[in-house]
């Protein structure tokens, strides 16, 4: 069915979001059209504000509205441990369990030879710089349990072990192929507590 151009464009915009197919995008577009002007304006304003006001922390790479982020400026955290994650959603998932008290490093991707993504294409150099300049003695690699997550974990391990840095991996309470952001708090807590050395 053909829709008027403004609705078709709105459907197209919604369907660019991850996990949103044409059917859901169509539902969202029609819902948006039915919203009050005030709600639509607030929605648009919030989208633009998030895009303009958020940045990446210059230390850890986490999404933040302050640079450095509130985690990196928290001196009560354990300076000896850095937990390495794929993206900012994983930081939020780990923070929900309120049991990890070290710092983070966000890679903004994973090494993926099949997709042409190498170590230089992710936020790895700044991790090395941080480790050489800081007090961290352990890196916990908390990438997802996928082929790319495993490849990234092994690369980080081979890179850091010669420097005398202990490299551990989250325990396997997480299903292979699953994303950290979708794991429940108990699973994440056990994965940290039972981490294994790489």
Swiss-Prot record:
<keyword id="KW-0227">DNA damage</keyword>
<dbReference type="GO" id="GO:0006281">
    <property type="term" value="P:DNA repair"/>
</dbReference>
<keyword id="KW-0862">Zinc</keyword>
<dbReference type="InterPro" id="IPR006171">
    <property type="entry name" value="TOPRIM_dom"/>
</dbReference>
<dbReference type="InterPro" id="IPR000093">
    <property type="entry name" value="DNA_Rcmb_RecR"/>
</dbReference>
<comment type="function">
    <text>May play a role in DNA repair. It seems to be involved in an RecBC-independent recombinational process of DNA repair. It may act with RecF and RecO.</text>
</comment>
<dbReference type="Pfam" id="PF02132">
    <property type="entry name" value="RecR_ZnF"/>
</dbReference>
<dbReference type="Pfam" id="PF21175">
    <property type="entry name" value="RecR_C"/>
</dbReference>
<dbReference type="InterPro" id="IPR015967">
    <property type="entry name" value="Rcmb_RecR_Znf"/>
</dbReference>
<protein>
    <recommendedName>
        <fullName>Recombination protein RecR</fullName>
    </recommendedName>
</protein>
<dbReference type="Pfam" id="PF21176">
    <property type="entry name" value="RecR_HhH"/>
</dbReference>
<dbReference type="InterPro" id="IPR023627">
    <property type="entry name" value="Rcmb_RecR"/>
</dbReference>
<dbReference type="GO" id="GO:0003677">
    <property type="term" value="F:DNA binding"/>
</dbReference>
<feature type="domain" description="Toprim">
    <location>
        <begin position="80"/>
        <end position="175"/>
    </location>
</feature>
<dbReference type="GO" id="GO:0008270">
    <property type="term" value="F:zinc ion binding"/>
</dbReference>
<feature type="zinc finger region" description="C4-type">
    <location>
        <begin position="57"/>
        <end position="72"/>
    </location>
</feature>
<keyword id="KW-0479">Metal-binding</keyword>
<dbReference type="GO" id="GO:0006310">
    <property type="term" value="P:DNA recombination"/>
</dbReference>
<keyword id="KW-0234">DNA repair</keyword>
<dbReference type="Pfam" id="PF13662">
    <property type="entry name" value="Toprim_4"/>
</dbReference>
<comment type="similarity">
    <text>Belongs to the RecR family.</text>
</comment>
<keyword id="KW-0233">DNA recombination</keyword>
<keyword id="KW-0863">Zinc-finger</keyword>
<dbReference type="InterPro" id="IPR034137">
    <property type="entry name" value="TOPRIM_RecR"/>
</dbReference>
């Amino acid at each position: 069915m053909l829709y008027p151009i403004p609705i078709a464009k709105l459907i197209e915009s919604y369907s660019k979001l991850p996990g949103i197919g044409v059917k859901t995008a169509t539902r969202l577009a029609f819902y948006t059209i039915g919203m009050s002007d005030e709600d639509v304006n607030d929605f648009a304003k919030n989208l633009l504000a998030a895009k303009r006001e958020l940045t990446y922390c210059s230390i850890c790479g986490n999404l933040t509205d302050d640079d450095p982020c509130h985690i990196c400026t928290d001196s009560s955290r354990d300076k000896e441990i850095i937990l390495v994650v794929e993206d900012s959603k994983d930081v939020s998932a780990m923070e929900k369990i309120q049991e990890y008290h070290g710092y983070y490093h966000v890679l903004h991707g994973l090494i993926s030879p099949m997709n042409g993504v190498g170590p230089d294409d992710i936020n790895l150099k700044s991790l090395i710089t941080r480790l050489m300049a800081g007090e961290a003695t352990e890196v916990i690699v908390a990438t997802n349990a996928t082929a790319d997550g495993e490849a990234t974990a092994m690369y980080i391990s081979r890179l850091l072990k010669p420097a005398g840095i202990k490299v551990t991996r989250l325990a396997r309470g997480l299903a292979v192929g699953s994303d950290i952001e979708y794991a429940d708090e108990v699973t994440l807590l056990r994965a940290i507590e039972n981490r294994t050395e790489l």
